[in-house]
């Protein structure tokens, strides 16, 4: 790949304006001129502006197949509800001691058996029960799936799978490895967070789910979670964004200074990355942090954006599949 193709291999993609930060930690920064930045897809792809990236030649096939699934077919912010919905996360300092974590589902693809997880770490509602903990002084992120606090000696947690990401590093997980998310990606990196929205910019791609996905993945994803080989279904890691025409003709519908306008702009500039299978009908569900600072009436404006307003970004990366 030529040097101009950057982390996704996108001929006309732009470099990120600024690396997002959480708890004082930069989230997967691209180090200009480094081997990591030149070597193709890596974690810093999250932060790449894809508004000028070319459209995948098969974009129409993907969108038509997602539409054929039925169920929800508009952008659905899966967060809000006065702090009921969304995925929570917490940050800890150096005094938070490491506790035992027993991995019950995917031990061979998990990263840790001990981690600085507080006994009271918030757990996502529903069946996925994600727990996300950022260790601020090391910028180490610990994510768990199907997490349950057991307590007892050592304040133990049980989890279906675990993943550790150092936010200074852009290294991908091993091919074939899951994480706390089906695609092998970091969950926290793709959450819409109220603080960044309040500051007026979401400078990263947003996590999205679809009811059915393909038995395949595209970097930066490293794992699939499907038995379906239909080439028109979205693989894990598929990147989409709003089309030029839809964005420019509809931006005026989102009031200046509103949460919905900031997120709408992010859907165009940074897009969405397919990261997990949703439940029945759960297409175009975008994920945000659990918080009472969301304004549901405003976020509902995003529900007027149809899935057909999106195009698939041509990453020029190889789709990895056993099909």
Predicted segments — roles?
Residues 18-323:
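Short, surface-exposed polybasic-aromatic patches that bind anionic ligands, especially phosphate groups
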């Amino acid at each position: 790949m030529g040097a101009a193709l950057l982390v996704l291999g996108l001929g006309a993609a732009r470099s990120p304006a600024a690396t997002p930060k959480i708890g004082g930690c930069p989230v997967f920064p691209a180090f200009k001129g480094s081997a990591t930045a030149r070597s193709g897809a890596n974690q810093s792809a999250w932060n790449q502006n894809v508004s000028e990236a070319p459209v995948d030649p098969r974009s129409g096939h993907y969108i038509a197949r997602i539409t054929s699934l039925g169920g929800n077919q508009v952008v659905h912010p899966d967060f809000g509800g006065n702090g009921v919905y969304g995925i929570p996360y917490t940050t800890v300092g150096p005094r938070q001691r490491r506790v035992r974590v027993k991995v019950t589902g995917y031990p061979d693809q998990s990263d840790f058996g001990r981690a600085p997880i507080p006994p009271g770490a918030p757990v996502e509602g529903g069946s996925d029960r994600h727990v996300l903990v950022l260790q601020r002084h090391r910028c180490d992120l610990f994510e768990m799936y199907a997490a349950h606090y057991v307590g007892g000696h050592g304040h133990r947690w049980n989890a279906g799978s675990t993943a550790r990401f150092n936010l200074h590093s852009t290294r991908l997980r091993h091919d074939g490895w899951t994480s706390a998310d089906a695609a092998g990606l970091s969950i926290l990196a793709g959450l819409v967070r109220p603080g960044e929205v309040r500051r007026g910019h979401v400078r990263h791609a947003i996590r999205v789910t679809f009811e059915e996905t393909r038995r395949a993945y595209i970097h930066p994803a490293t794992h699939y979670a499907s038995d379906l080989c239909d080439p028109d279904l979205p693989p894990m890691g598929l990147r989409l964004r709003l089309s030029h025409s839809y964005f420019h003709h509809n931006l005026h519908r989102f009031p200046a200074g509103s949460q919905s306008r900031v997120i709408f702009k992010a859907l165009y500039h940074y897009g969405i990355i397919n990261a997990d299978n949703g439940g029945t009908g759960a297409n175009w569900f975008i994920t945000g942090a659990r918080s009472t600072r969301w304004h549901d009436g405003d976020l509902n404006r995003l529900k007027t954006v149809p899935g057909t307003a999106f195009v698939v970004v041509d990453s020029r990366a190889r789709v990895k599949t056993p099909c």
